[in-house]
Amino acid sequence: SEENKGMNFMSNFWFSTETEKKTSYFQLIFHIDNVKYRYGFEINENEVYNEWLYVTRHRETPVFIREGQNVNVTRSHMETGYDIANMKSKLFNEKVLFLSVADSFSDKLASRIVGEIKQFSKVNSKISLEEKKTTFLKDKLLKDKIIKLLKYADVGIEDIDQIVLGDEKIDATSSFLIGVHRKYDKNLNEIGTSVTLFDSMESEGTKEMLGISLPIITALELGTPIVIDEFGAKLHPLLTRKILSLFNSKENTRSQLIVATHTTELMDPRLLRRDQIDFVEKDKYGRSYLYTLVEIKGIRSEKYEQDYLEGKYGAVPFLGNWDNLCDIINDIENEED
């Protein structure tokens, strides 16, 4: 249903009897107009147990605190929210976040915070490419920016367009992205252009770069955060460093890039500070722990990548004896025979 669709993403940790029924805890700490906010909630698949919003100007004070269906609101911070809380379950139930209800009734602070949270986007390059292709193809200025970024990335693309194919029998059309490349004769003289179907003819790296180009440009222009999973998996290491440098430059004061990556070359003190490098370590019970490099005591070396691969920071896989793997496979095949 519409009211609890936001809980559909919930999935408990199923590898432990202690956590399979336990609530999950989420919290965001962020700034709006140089004012610090802390918003969070505890939920399971069916119910909101706790929810809170704090603001810090001179000191941290509560905007609202929710326990079950009981909500205490500071009226001076959230006037419409205060009225909603007094009406209790007539306007919201245990499956709905109080902040979203206050937003739907146009509470000024709630709407501002929800608007900021909605700017926080997780980038799936393939989905982004399909969903946004009409947007950037119709916007010449935006398209020019994307083409410029692709040229800087040295992927060989001169232009991007689309072809539209119609089917009169079913009254439908399909559109396909195409890439425009320079074409040369045997003497390497430019003689025109050649086109490629993006989905089937371009490399995975080129498709990845196009897919993340629009979110990157949007984030840098609007000062919003983005999250990219498996960052660098399909891109050249020099290119991933350049992208990271864009967000880590002095010119960028608002936007934030958060990535999950196995590209250890990015663990470079010339590129990232220790407090900007986090690790996720999974133990033998399947539990994952997040910690930052700055929390690890006694680090004097700046060879972050080398030290990490040597296991000095943890968060490396426990690999078996691969030297004997071929023998083990052969033994299994012999047993099958």
Model-identified regions with their sequence ranges:
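Conserved P-loop NTP-binding catalytic core
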Residues: 1-38, 44-48
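C-terminal lobe/lid and adjacent interdomain/linker elements of RecA-like ASCE P-loop ATPase modules
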Residues: 242-337
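Conserved ABC ATPase signature
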Residues: 169-217, 221, 225, 231-235
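Short alpha-helix of the ABC ATPase nucleotide-binding domain corresponding to the H-loop/switch region
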Residues: 236-241
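Hydrophobic "anchor" residues on beta-strands that sit immediately upstream
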Residues: 36, 225-226
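Electropositive, glycine-dotted interaction segments
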Residues: 36-167
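Phosphate-binding glycine-rich loops of NTP-binding sites
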Residues: 1-13, 209-215, 245-246, 260
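Post-Walker A helix-loop "phosphate-sensing" segment adjacent to the P-loop in P-loop NTPases
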Residues: 1-7, 220-221, 250-253
